[in-house]
C-alpha cells in the first residue's frame, strides 16, 4: 500500500474515533458517522422496471426521444438557431445535471446538440434519466 494512502486511512480512523467516541453523544455521532460514510457508499440507482418503462418513456418517445440500439439508453438530437442558443441550452442542462449528480453523454456541433441518457451505475435506464429528459423537454418548450 502506498504510504500516502496508508497515512490517509490512519487519519480517517483517527478522525472517526475522535468524532464518535469523545465529543458527541452516541446518537449524534452515529448520524454524523453515517452521513460521512454515505458520501463514499452511495445507494445504487435502480433500473426502470418494465411498467415504469412503458409509462414513463411513452411521453418522451412522443417528444422525439428514441431508444438507442444495442444499449439501454435514450437519445435525442436538438437543433437551435445558432451556437449561442445551443450553448445556453447546454449550460442549463449542465447545471441541472450537476445538481442531480447525473451527467449526459452529449455531442455539440454549432447549432446541434445530441444527447444520450443512461445511468452507468446500474447499467441502463433509471428514474434519473427520465427526470433529466423531462427537465430537458421543459426548457426546450420555453
UniProtKB/Swiss-Prot annotation:
The keyword Transit peptide does not apply. One of its GO terms (biological process) is tetrahydrobiopterin biosynthetic process. Transmembrane segments: none annotated. InterPro entries: PCD_sf (IPR036428), Pterin_deHydtase (IPR001533). It catalyses: (4aS,6R)-4a-hydroxy-L-erythro-5,6,7,8-tetrahydrobiopterin = (6R)-L-erythro-6,7-dihydrobiopterin + H2O. It comes from the Eukaryota. Keywords: Lyase. CDD domains: PCD_DCoH_subfamily_b. One of its GO terms (molecular function) is 4-alpha-hydroxytetrahydrobiopterin dehydratase activity. Its EC number is 4.2.1.96. The keyword Lyase applies. Belongs to the pterin-4-alpha-carbinolamine dehydratase family. This is Putative pterin-4-alpha-carbinolamine dehydratase. The gene is pcbd-1.
